[in-house]
């Protein structure tokens, strides 16, 4: 309890902190998003032991900028695009200020009636705002379900799986009364898509329930056919299907599982259907986006994070169940010191969660909904999706980038055309600046960049500024890779970035035959020219591949052979490595290893027996470089994108 004099101190310092927070949030876009610190950076700035005597508040307050802020990733910045949003707002901050002052532990109704009852009513508000079924409401005549605020969606998924497990084991014991619960548990199996969040796997580890991650369709969506097939296979193996986690808005590409197909299967097979809409749940404030909810009437539980996109700061997760009694039978413990006069009549949320104690989370949610109203919250969602559409249009206008998955809501995934190493290098260049925060993901073996519109204050100018930084990084990477160790003839190969349409870019490079040996066809060499370039600026793949003693005739003979040989071989290939550091993979069976491998010269001669003798005059590594140069599938008809040019080569190592 504070002394009267301390209230005045708190009042003054509180105003000072509010002023600091306002200044921080209003200027956060001007700060570098990611810090320039290394692990352990704070150790040297903080004493090894706590102070024996109190520090002054002025000293503590000064250390915020000196010690804390240099190591902060600024999640509220409009230039923070790495993860799904983690937004806040002034009503949310004020709500937690009050909740922290009250500091009640609402484990039972009796421990804080307002904490329990406000939460019940606000969860009903929220369910109606999202268009959820009536059976998720606390206050509805036909409902035996309701909603509760949990800490995270990860915890909600675990709670749902534990409830499903308990309910299924009780069903199994009715038919096998003598069976041990652990042996019954060992037969259980649950399902999710291979795009599901990592928390699903963790829930399986904790509950000791096997989780099978099922393949998705071309839109990264889990379909009913895949689920039904897995269920039938597992039942034949003696397993008992128990649980399905359907994701609405996956982490990687914001894909949506097909509830309308999964739901009927779960109902027919007796599986608990849990819906994870951690990010996308806020979008359902807009009725026109609720098409993804088709099939929600089959759900046994539903969860989403207001703490992501709804401007309610962490932690705040909504979790609804169709049947609260299945939840309570899983988590109910009832020691005498937790009983009260209204036990059994009032709702005690300690039976709806894993911990006993719980915070007064509903105040900040109540403040936010009342302060903004449904219409302004809907407008907030619309703004985020509009900004994502704008970024998508910028990416699509640049032919060196591609968007490998459909944009949904505020997430755009994109990549640099070509091998994964190009996209990885772009990310590294962007990370060096600290001005934009982006992270990678993978889909179908392609490395992608996730760009999420997060801040409610993001403008088109912010998006354009970040896009220009991305393009600058891409241009730098492409120029470095395409002119790595250039020969004098290649010094002008990559021009400064210019604005040209895709047709110009595609047709900007021509394949020509240059005869330097009179009428001898073997001395015709293939080179690549940009319009307006002289022969001195063209790229020759044979630089540095041969020793200095090799004649031009030798080089030209091998050039002609490789061109004709590999053009045919590439048409036979069924698989090709995407790595820039490995040889193309041939569909032809490799010769079995034998003792000749130990004798490099003999083995090399045997491998090259069908090649011209000039092959033996190449430098070490020269053959590999030339093979890569000519190994783009169906050369020369196909080409790999390299910067603002179309080069029929591997952009990282084909040029020497």
Swiss-Prot record:
It comes from the Eukaryota. The modification Phosphoserine is found at residues 343, 362. CDD domains: DOPA_deC_like. Keywords: Catecholamine biosynthesis, Decarboxylase, Lyase, Phosphoprotein, Pyridoxal phosphate. Brain, glandular regions of the stomach, mast cells and fetal liver. GO terms for biological process: catecholamine biosynthetic process; histamine biosynthetic process; histamine metabolic process; L-histidine catabolic process; L-histidine metabolic process. May be post-translationally processed. Residues 481-502 are annotated as: Disordered. GO terms for cellular component: cytoplasm; dendrite; neuronal cell body. Its cofactor is pyridoxal 5'-phosphate. Catalyzes the biosynthesis of histamine from histidine. A putative trans-splicing which involves HDC and SHBG gene regions produces a fusion protein expressed in fetal liver. This is Histidine decarboxylase. It comes from Rattus norvegicus.
């Amino acid at each position: 309890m504070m002394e009267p004099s301390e209230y005045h101190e708190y009042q003054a310092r509180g105003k000072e902190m509010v002023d600091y927070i306002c200044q921080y949030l209003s200027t956060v876009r001007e700060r570098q998003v990611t810090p320039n610190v290394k692990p352990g950076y704070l150790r040297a700035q903080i004493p090894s032991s706590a102070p024996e005597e109190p520090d002054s508040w002025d000293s503590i307050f000064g250390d915020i900028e000196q010690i804390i802020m240099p190591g902060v990733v600024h999640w509220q910045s409009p230039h923070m695009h790495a993860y799904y949003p983690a937004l806040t707002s002034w009503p949310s901050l004020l709500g937690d200020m009050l909740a922290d002052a009250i500091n009640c532990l609402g484990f039972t109704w009796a421990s804080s009636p307002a904490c329990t009852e406000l939460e019940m009513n606000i969860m009903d508000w929220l369910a109606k705002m999202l268009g959820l079924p009536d059976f998720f409401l606390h206050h509805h005549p036909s409902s035996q379900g309701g909603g509760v605020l949990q800490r995270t969606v990860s915890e909600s998924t675990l709670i749902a799986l534990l409830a499903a497990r308990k309910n299924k084991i009780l069903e199994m014991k009715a038919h096998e009364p003598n069976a041990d619960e652990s042996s019954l548990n060992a037969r259980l199996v649950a399902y999710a898509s291979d795009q599901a969040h990592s928390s699903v796997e963790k829930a399986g580890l904790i509950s000791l329930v096997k989780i099978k991650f099922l393949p998705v369709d071309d839109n990264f969506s889990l379909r009913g056919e895949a689920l039904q097939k897995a269920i039938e296979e597992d039942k034949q193996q003696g397993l008992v299907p128990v649980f399905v986690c359907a994701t609405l808005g996956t982490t990687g590409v914001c894909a949506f599982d097909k509830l309308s197909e999964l739901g009927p299967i779960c109902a027919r097979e007796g599986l608990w259907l849990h819906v994870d809409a951690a990010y996308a749940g806020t979008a359902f404030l807009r009725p026109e986006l609720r098409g993804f909810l088709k099939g929600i009437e089959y759900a046994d539980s539903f969860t989403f994070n207001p703490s992501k996109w709804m401007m309610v700061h962490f932690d705040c997760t909504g979790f609804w169940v169709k049947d609260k009694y299945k939840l309570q039978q899983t988590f109910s413990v009832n020691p005498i010191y937790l009983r009260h006069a209204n036990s059994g009549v009032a709702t005690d949320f300690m039976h709806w969660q894993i911990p006993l104690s719980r915070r007064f989370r509903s105040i900040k949610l109540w403040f936010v909904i009342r302060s903004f109203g449904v219409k302004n919250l809907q407008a907030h969602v619309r703004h985020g999706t509009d900004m994502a559409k704008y970024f998508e249009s910028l990416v699509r206008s640049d032919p060196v980038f591609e968007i490998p998955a459909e944009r949904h809501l505020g997430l755009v995934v994109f990549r640099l055309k070509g091998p994964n190493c190009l996209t990885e290098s772009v990310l590294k260049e962007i990370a060096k600046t600290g001005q934009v925060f982006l992270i990678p993901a993978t889909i179908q073996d392609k490395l992608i960049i996730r760009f999420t519109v997060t801040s409610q204050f993001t403008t088109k100018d912010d998006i354009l500024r970040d896009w220009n930084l991305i393009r600058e990084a891409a241009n730098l990477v492409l120029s470095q890779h395409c002119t790595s160790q250039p020969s004098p003839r290649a010094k002008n190969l990559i021009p400064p970035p210019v604005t040209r349409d895709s047709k110009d870019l595609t047709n900007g490079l021509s394949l020509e035959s240059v005869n330097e040996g009179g009428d001898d066809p073997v001395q015709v060499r293939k080179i690549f020219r940009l319009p307006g370039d002289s022969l001195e600026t063209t790229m020759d793949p044979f630089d540095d591949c041969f020793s200095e003693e090799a004649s031009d005739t030798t080089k030209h003979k091998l050039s002609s052979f490789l061109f004709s040989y590999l053009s045919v071989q590439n048409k036979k290939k069924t698989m090709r490595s995407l790595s820039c550091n490995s040889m193309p993979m041939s569909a032809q069976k490799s010769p079995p290893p034998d003792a000749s491998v130990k004798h490099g010269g003999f083995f090399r001669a045997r491998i090259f027996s069908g090649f011209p003798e000039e092959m033996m005059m190449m430098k070490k590594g020269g053959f590999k470089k030339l093979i890569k140069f000519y190994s783009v599938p169906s050369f020369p008809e196909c080409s790999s994108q390299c910067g603002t040019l179309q080069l029929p080569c591997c952009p990282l190592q084909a040029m020497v």
